[in-house]
Amino acid sequence: EQLPEDWRRFFLSPELTVQSVSGDNNVSGATLKKQAAVIQLINAWRTQGHLRAKLDPLGLNPPADVPSLQPGFWGLSEEDLLQEFSVTFGAHTTQMPLKQLLNLLEQAWAGSQAYELAHLENREEINWLLSRIESSNAPQADVQTCIARFEKLMAAETLERYLHTRYVGQKRFSLEGGESAIPALDTLTKRLRAQGVEEMVIGMAHRGRLNVLVNLLNKDPAQLFAEFEGKQTIGSGSGDVKYHMGYSSNLETPAGSLHVALAYNPSHLEIVNPVVLGQVRARQERRGEDGQAKVVGVLIHGDSALGGLGVNQTTFNLSQTQGYGTGGTLHLVINNQIGFTTSRLQDMRSSRYCTDIAKMVAAPIIHVNGDDVDAVCQVMELACEWRDTFRRDIIIDICCFRKHSGCSPWYARPLW
């Protein structure tokens, strides 16, 4: 009664008055409650499904027991497994039995791949990722693609085995246990070039560098062997050790030539990362408005060094700024589950994952079992598509192992 006349007419208008509901609606309160429980179950899988993923190729860290991923946690019974519910899965809303939904959730969120999206803030980005993660129409690799991946995998393994037997005791920082990174990087170069990228700059530490030099950048193996044998020409090169060396080459892909540069690396882990992104930014600015579409930065991290060194926090912090942003960096973690001599999680860090630092910039985080080469390459393709669409960072955590520890871990590890 105290409102002005025009506001009273507004609230009393027919459009806002309560309408009676037809009595032939047979949906019961119990049914609505179960439907709400199914929605909660789906959300639980999307936020906590990564805890159930099969990520460790050694099986030393089995998937966690997560009560909220079980229907019973939300009040659903075995009798409900055959009942159909309305669900939004991927990009579609449909009716399906609860049992079928559980199988789809398990496949999408707890296989060889695991996704962390709960820290993302942008609804468009979340929906984009959900439509791809939960898609049942994901393209499968054809025979020729699988053969190419196998050849890259064998090339990586063969090189490491040869160096191990030919140059016994020499430092080489083997990639063994994480060889799937090589077919993944090969997939990366082909996908980026198909998207129109013409230059890629890589920053990485020493582990796996020799393999990347030979099996990605096509460095002549004879030149690498000469470095092992001390046969370099006096006065040529920088005189630095072989696992610090940079290189550049033009890689031929089905979509054309891609120039790839691997930055030189000092022994101080991760310190090269801002240097690489500075190079990327300079190359982009030289190209003008479409620079971010033509030049991409790729950073390859170690698991303990990623969160352990402050330079990475600073690099992430500047990644979206006007003066230093590069339109998204592709981060790849060679996670061999051992930081120098420390393999127990409680001795390494205070967070569950080594990639948790990336949550500060709301970057999607993908964990993948390094022994599933097809899964590793599949998420690499997804990462390229993400960067091309949103111009933001994304991080892939390849969970693998270190085949040769250099000495007995019982001597090298801290006492406990």
Regions found by a protein language model. Give the residues of each.
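Extended, charge-enriched "interface" segments that sit outside catalytic cores
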Residues: 3, 10-181, 197
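Short alpha-helical segments and helix-capping/turn motifs at coil-helix boundaries
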Residues: 37-40, 88-89, 102-103, 113, ...
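Conserved phosphate/anionic-ligand binding catalytic regions in large, soluble enzymes, centered on
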Residues: 40-57, 187-216, 301-321, 391, ...
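Phosphate/diphosphate-binding loops
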Residues: 87-91, 223-231, 343-346, 358, ...
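Electropositive phosphate-/nucleotide-binding environments in soluble metabolic enzymes
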Residues: 95, 99, 179-182, 266-273, ...
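Generic secondary-structure signature for well-ordered alpha-helical cores
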Residues: 110, 114, 155-158, 190-194, ...
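Active-site pocket-lining segments that scaffold enzyme catalytic pockets across diverse folds
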Residues: 158, 162-222
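Cofactor-binding active-site loop characterized by glycine-rich and histidine/acidic residues
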Residues: 198-370
